[in-house]
Regions:
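Short glycine-aspartate micro-motif
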Residues: 4-8, 16, 62-67, 145, ...
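N-terminal phosphate-binding loop and adjacent alpha-helix
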Residues: 26-61
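Active-site nucleophile and cofactor-binding loops and adjacent substrate-binding regions
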Residues: 66-69, 88-91, 115-123, 142-148, ...
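Gly/Ser/Thr-rich active-site cleft segment
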Residues: 9-11, 112-242, 247-250
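Glycine/Thr-rich phosphate-binding loops that ligate phosphate moieties of nucleotide
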Residues: 1-30, 67-105, 279-285, 296-484
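Phosphate/pyrophosphate-binding loops at sites that engage ATP/ADP/AMP, CoA/4′-phosphopantetheine
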Residues: 49-63, 134-139, 196-209, 392-404
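Short acidic, glycine/serine/threonine-rich loops at helix termini
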Residues: 76-79, 156-160, 164-172, 227-231, ...
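Short coil/turn connectors at secondary-structure junctions
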Residues: 1-2, 71, 84-86, 140-143, ...
């Protein structure tokens, strides 16, 4: 049996899955936590990676490994390969002003044309501008910029700070992949190149813009190298005669798409703390409104994506208000009729990104003596959650993305009411895969690709399928309050 490993280095934790290359069956898993916060010392990710690999039984019998991870995080290195300051993560919003400044300077249309996306505070370019404006001494020391998975891959291959790694600070050995590079706002999915002029204009006042080392973007099925001779893994030969192959890696959403086996016509709707709606397409997508981020995927195609701030927490809030758990919330919701008796929850509890209403608050419309029941409130919560995600699906469709099936994933997807009502709201058949670590699974699949030169043909087990159950009243009510 040939084994391959995949890593999901997310905001909250590091998860490792070891799979059988031939069948895709999970052989063993491991996990370790990450510290909380919106800025984190990358050393904590390395510690967690080592712990998660150890928890998963180590690498002695593994032939290849690949790392997928949270996108956008800014890891800045000096000439000795040392991290200059804690990494600013995707959810650190201090660079919102920098994002607005960049849009004012270049124009949304030009930025979308050059990089596929209009930058928001999440994106790496805005964080570099913030660094230049607010920490000029740190900005002046920057010799290289990497993303979280880039840095972990570099370290796993044996590179790192001078005196603390077997191969030393060879910055030119930093690598990334198309999917993660596309979230920087200085790499173009359409051309496959860095926009050095844009980066220099945004960060060049530090005197380092034109000199920065940026990770080499390698092909999806290529390999970045092999696991280095590290103290943490003293016998890195693994199951292969030439060492453990290290794959290109990927951004987390691209990793999930790869793990799910998403194909043209599939739209992935992921319901976590926030929500994402994305699809694999054959052509690059640009959206000057900024609603759709024109990312690349992990196979050589493209991954247009829409994000919402409010997702599973909507159910948390309403379940808490009703004094029930999530399962009972779903039971209550399915007792009510589509449209919730006229109750409509506009669920902007944390403001919203799609549509762009950062200062909005949640509002419950249509409360009457007849409509205000526990059942209707429970269903209004689920309908509001899904209508917000349907806005994302609509934005993708407006950019030419076709949807013949929804792949509904995330913890909330396991709630029976969410699946049923999704088939009413999206007006597209809904498939709910078996629960799994699909980001790590995608990384493992990519590791197999790097090892053999062929993308493993693993299948995704579908737990539940819902046919279309059109309930037009839900969308009509939601659109009516949105336009009021």
């Amino acid at each position: 049996m040939t084994l391959v490993a995949g890593v999901d280095s997310s905001t909250q934790s590091c998860k490792v899955v070891v799979r059988d290359l031939e069948t895709g069956a999970t052989v063993r898993t491991g996990r370790a936590s990450h510290p909380d916060g919106t800025e984190v010392d990358p050393a904590a990710w390395w510690t967690a990676l080592v712990a998660a690999i150890t928890d998963a039984g180590g690498l002695d019998d593994v032939a290849a490994i690949s790392i997928a991870g949270q996108q956008h995080g800014m890891v800045v290195l000096d000439g000795e390969g040392r991290v200059i300051r804690p990494a600013l993560l995707w959810n650190d919003t201090r660079s919102a002003g920098a994002a607005a400044d960049l849009i004012a300077e270049f124009g949304a249309a030009d930025l979308a044309e050059r990089t596929g996306s209009v930058p928001v505070a999440s994106f790496t370019l805005t964080k570099l501008r913030w660094l230049q404006q607010n920490e000029p001494q740190n900005a002046a020391r920057v010799a290289a910029v990497a993303l979280p998975h880039d840095w972990l891959t570099w370290r796993l291959r044996g590179y790192g700070p001078a005196g603390e790694s077997p191969l030393g600070p060879v910055l030119a050995e930093l690598t990334t992949d198309r999917s993660d590079a596309s979230g920087t706002s200085y790499w173009s999915p359409a051309t496959g190149t860095y926009d050095r002029a844009l980066l220099d204009a945004a960060f060049g006042n530090s005197g380092k813009g034109h000199e920065l080392v940026l990770p080499t973007v390698i092909a999806p099925g290529a390999h970045a190298g092999t696991v280095g001779r590290l103290p943490e893994f003293p016998t890195p030969a693994g199951a292969g005669a030439t060492g453990i192959v290290v794959g290109a890696g990927a951004g987390d959403n691209a990793g999930a798409a790869l793990g799910l086996g998403a194909a043209a016509g599939d739209v992935v709707v992921s319901i976590g703390t926030s929500g994402t709606v994305f699809a694999v397409t054959e052509t690059a997508v640009r959206d000057e409104s900024g609603t759709v981020a024109g990312f690349a995927d992990a196979t050589g195609l493209f991954l247009p994506l829409v994000a919402t701030l409010n997702a599973a927490r909507i159910l948390d809030v309403v379940a808490g208000l009703l004094g029930v758990g999530h399962e009972e919330l779903g039971t209550l919701a399915l007792t009510a009729e589509p449209g919730s008796g006229g109750l409509v929850l506009q669920p902007y509890f944390e403001g919203e990104r799609t549509p762009n209403r950062p200062d909005a608050a949640a509002t419950l419309f249509g409360m009457t003596l007849a409509s205000t029941t526990r059942e209707n409130l429970a269903r209004a919560a689920v309908e509001g959650l899904l209508c917000g995600l349907a806005d994302g699906l609509g934005a993708l469709r407006d950019r030419g993305v076709s949807a013949s099936r929804i792949l509904l994933v995330g913890g909330a997807a396991q709630n029976a009411a969410v699946g049923v009502i999704a088939s009413e709201v999206f007006d597209v058949p809904v498939s709910i895969p078996e629960p799994g670590e699909y980001v790590a699974a995608g990384a493992a699949r990519q590791a197999g690709w790097a090892l053999t030169g062929e993308l493993p043909a693993w299948s995704t087990a579908i737990a539940v399928e819902h046919p279309v159950r059109t309930a037009a009243v839900i969308g009509e009510q939601y659109r009516a309050v949105a336009s009021a």
